C-alpha cells in the first residue's frame, strides 16, 4: 500500500495531501519498481526493472515509511483520508499527540511499543528555522536539544559549561553551479577560471568559522567511495586571468551570482559567501551581480535555468554515494 500509493496514480490515496512524492519520483522509483508482492504475513518481495545497488539504502529513508492500509481504508470510509498523514499510525516508540503546522509536534511514549520502552515520557519538536532563535531557546531551557547552530555561535557555546556541544562531520556539500547553457559558461576555460579565482579557505574561515573543509569531490570525505587522490582547484587568480585570456575574455565580463535566501548546514550565510566570491571575481575582471529570491521562487527559477551561477547544496539522505551522484548528476536530476 505505502509504495503503490506513491507509484500508482489510480490509487485512491495518490492525490491525498497534495499527491507530491518528491523523493520517490526524483529517485526514479516509479520506473524502477515493477511490482511489490506479498510472500507471507511478514515478507514482501520487490521486483525491479534493473539491478539497483543502493535500493536497500533508499528503503531506509523517510519516504519509504510503512503506513497502515487498514487505517487508511478506515479513514477513507469515514471521509477523512488526510488523517493518514496528519494523524498517522506507525510502529515506533512514541505516539503522536498534537501537530501544529509550522509550530510544534508533540509525542508521548507509547506503552504498547514492541521494543525497549523510551526513557522519556514526552517528546516535543519545536519548529524553529532560525538558528539564533534556537540558541536563545536553549539558553533559556525552553528546549534541551538543538541542531545546526550558527558557526559564529560555536565558540560561545564551547565556553558555556551548561551546554554539551557535540560535533561530527556533516554529510553534506555546498557548491556553486554553473549554467553551461548560457555564454560564456559554455566554455570550460571560463568555468575553470571562475573556480581558480575563488579563495575557498577564506570562505571557510569567514562563513563557516573554520567548521568546514574545501570540497574537491561531490561526496563528503566521511562517505565510503571518497577518492582523496582527486586534485582540488587551488586559489590562483593569475591562472584564472590566463584562462580568461585564452577564452578571449581578458577584459572581463559581467555575470549574475544567485545567493540562497535561507540558512542551510552546507551554507549558513549565503549572502556573505556571495559577497566574498563577488570580490574574488572582481580581482580577475569579472563583475558579479548578486541576485536572490524567496526560497520557493529561487528553486523554481533555478530549475527553469534562469541563472548563470547559483548557490546550491545537498545533504545526504541514506549514506550511499549514489544519493549524491544520481540525485545531482543523473539525467533525471537534469530535468
Segments from the language model and where they lie:
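Ligand-site clamp/hinge motif
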Residues: 1, 82-85, 110-156, 167, ...
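Surface-exposed binding/hinge segments that line
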Residues: 16-73
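Append "and occasionally in soluble cytosolic enzymes with long acidic Gly/Pro-rich linkers
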Residues: 106-111, 159, 186-279, 283
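Aromatic- and charge-enriched surface segment that lines or borders ligand/interaction sites
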Residues: 1-13, 39, 45-47, 134-137, ...
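Extracytoplasmic/peripheral linker and loop segments enriched in polar/acidic and small residues
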Residues: 34-37, 189, 204, 283-298, ...
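Short, well-ordered beta-strand elements
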Residues: 44-46, 92-95, 105-106, 121-127, ...
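Alpha-to-beta junction loops
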Residues: 42-44, 139-148, 276-280, 284-287, ...
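Acidic-aromatic pocket-rim loops
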Residues: 12, 299-335
Amino acid at each position: 500500500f505505502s509504495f503503490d500509493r506513491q507509484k500508482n496514480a489510480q490509487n485512491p490515496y495518490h492525490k491525498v495531501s497534495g499527491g507530491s512524492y518528491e523523493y520517490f519520483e526524483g529517485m526514479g522509483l516509479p520506473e524502477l519498481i515493477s511490482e511489490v508482492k506479498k510472500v507471507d504475513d511478514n515478507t514482501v518481495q520487490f521486483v525491479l526493472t534493473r539491478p539497483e545497488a543502493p535500493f536497500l539504502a533508499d528503503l531506509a529513508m523517510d519516504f519509504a515509511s510503512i503506513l497502515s492500509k487498514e487505517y487508511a481504508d478506515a479513514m477513507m470510509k469515514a471521509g477523512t483520508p488526510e488523517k493518514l498523514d496528519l494523524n498517522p499510525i506507525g510502529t515506533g516508540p512514541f505516539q503522536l499527540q498534537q501537530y501544529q503546522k509550522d509550530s510544534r509536534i508533540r509525542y508521548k511514549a507509547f506503552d504498547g511499543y514492541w521494543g525497549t520502552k523510551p526513557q522519556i515520557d514526552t517528546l516535543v519538536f519545536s519548529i524553529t528555522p532560525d538558528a539564533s532563535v534556537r540558541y536563545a531557546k536553549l539558553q533559556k531551557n525552553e528546549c534541551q536539544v538543538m541542531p545546526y547552530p550558527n558557526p559564529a555561535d560555536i565558540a560561545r557555546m564551547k565556553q558555556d559549561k551548561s551546554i554539551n556541544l557535540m560535533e561530527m562531520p556533516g554529510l553534506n556539500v555546498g557548491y556553486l553551479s554553473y549554467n553551461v547553457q548560457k555564454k560564456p559558461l559554455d566554455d570550460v576555460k571560463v568555468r575553470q577560471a571562475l573556480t581558480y579565482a575563488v579563495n575557498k579557505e577564506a570562505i571557510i574561515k569567514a562563513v563557516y568559522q573554520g567548521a568546514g573543509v574545501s570540497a574537491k569531490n561531490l561526496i563528503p570525505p566521511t562517505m565510503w567511495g571518497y577518492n582523496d587522490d582527486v586534485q582540488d582547484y587551488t586559489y590562483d587568480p593569475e591562472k584564472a586571468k590566463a584562462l580568461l585570456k585564452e577564452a578571449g575574455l581578458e577584459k572581463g565580463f559581467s555575470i549574475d551570482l544567485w545567493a540562497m535566501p535561507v540558512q542551510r548546514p552546507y551554507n549558513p550565510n549565503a549572502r556573505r559567501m556571495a559577497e566574498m566570491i563577488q570580490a574574488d571575481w572582481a580581482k580577475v575582471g569579472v563583475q558579479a551581480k548578486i541576485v536572490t529570491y524567496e526560497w520557493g521562487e529561487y528553486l523554481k527559477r533555478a530549475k527553469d535555468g534562469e541563472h548563470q551561477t547559483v548557490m546550491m547544496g545537498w545533504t545526504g539522505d541514506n549514506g550511499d554515494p549514489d544519493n549524491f551522484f544520481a540525485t545531482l548528476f543523473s539525467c533525471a536530476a537534469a530535468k
